[in-house]
């Protein structure tokens, strides 16, 4: 698997004095069931045993073991929701 951290995400992490992120496929409950929701957070996960570790552009990226991708790669980026920037992961298959 190839993991990249784009320029926007690197700037976001530098602004928040972070050098690592972790990502997994979470879920959002709705009336119709659970909708898969890829998630990414700054920092390190509580249990490193559950994650594979990658380094991209000086950023440590922890990816939950068993994560499936659409094309063999994940990209950590930043999206803007209303006026707030937040980390996002692209390329997870679900």
Feature roles, as predicted:
Residues 1-94:
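Domain-level signature for proteins that mediate thiol-based redox and metal-cofactor handling
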